[in-house]
């Protein structure tokens, strides 16, 4: 993805998930979104090559980590399958992204021929893309969810730095995309982080706040799904007003006040844990992303 890279290692003989690793996308320093990265390739003669080199090196390292966790070796790796937005797939395969930058937003390929440039001698296959801004991650998601086999209309959402939507069923889908911004990936949020170890991924209320953490252990921050969950729970508990204001303790329900403090502007700051909090600015960033 634009913000996060996740690798899952499977034993295909028995279908077992052997290990999972994730990290910030190594290209993040070149731009928070795909438009910034496309621009980088247009402004520098070696831009595309540099971005390709960064992401391929990162995937190689993450695969090494995944294999180590599973006590497996590179010699056992038979195939690498990648699904991502169209720009990310192009950059990994060392292809030009100039055509995606302007009307009619035509990519060099939609990866209908899935074979890509091998990584360390291991064959690489890409999920087929739909268009310049509807990538192989959407195709993979529709297949994995089973929506392609269902009657009637169903809405599939991929909410991240780029937001894609697909509406339809077994007779086909209509797809579109929007630049939703990095908030859904935890970027620009005071305690935000990608969906990697330590990220709060789900929040719920059950006589108190309960949460799930990616990889287990102590929470370090909020990823996109955790941010959405927390905002929904706070709205339900009347800590966030209908218009989106995060209330200070004196305006919030009595049972919620121990999690709140007042900021310098008269709004609330909510503390899920001593290390993980939500500010009024975070709520606003989420509203803008939506």
Where are these regions (language model features)?
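Secondary-structure boundary motif
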Residues: 68-72, 147
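Membrane-interfacial loop-to-helix junctions in multi-pass inner-membrane proteins
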Residues: 72-78
């Amino acid at each position: 993805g634009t913000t996060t890279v996740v690798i899952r290692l499977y034993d295909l003989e028995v279908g077992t998930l052997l290990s999972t690793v994730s990290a910030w996308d190594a290209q993040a320093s070149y731009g928070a979104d795909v438009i910034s990265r496309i621009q980088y390739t247009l402004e520098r003669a070696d831009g595309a090559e540099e971005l390709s080199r960064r992401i391929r090196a990162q995937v190689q390292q993450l695969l090494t980590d995944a294999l180590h966790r599973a006590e497996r070796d590179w010699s056992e790796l038979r195939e690498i399958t990648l699904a991502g937005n169209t720009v990310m797939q192009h950059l990994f395969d060392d292809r030009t992204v100039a055509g995606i930058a302007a009307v009619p937003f035509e990519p060099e390929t939609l990866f209908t021929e899935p074979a890509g440039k091998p990584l360390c001698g291991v064959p690489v296959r890409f999920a087929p893309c739909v268009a310049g801004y509807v990538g192989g991650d959407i195709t993979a998601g529709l297949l994995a969810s089973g929506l392609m086999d269902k009657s009637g209309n169903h809405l599939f959402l991929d909410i991240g730095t780029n937001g894609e939507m697909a509406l339809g069923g077994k007779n086909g889908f209509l797809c579109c995309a929007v630049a939703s911004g990095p908030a859904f990936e935890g970027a620009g949020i005071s305690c935000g982080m990608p969906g990697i170890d330590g990220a709060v991924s789900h929040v719920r209320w059950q006589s108190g706040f309960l949460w799930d953490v990616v990889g287990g252990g102590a929470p370090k921050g909020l990823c996109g799904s955790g941010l959405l969950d927390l905002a929904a729970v706070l709205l339900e508990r009347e800590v966030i007003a209908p218009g989106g204001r995060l209330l200070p303790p004196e305006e919030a329900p009595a049972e919620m006040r121990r999690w709140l403090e007042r900021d310098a502007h008269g709004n609330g700051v909510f503390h899920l844990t001593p290390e993980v909090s939500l500010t009024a600015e975070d709520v606003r960033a989420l509203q803008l992303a939506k």
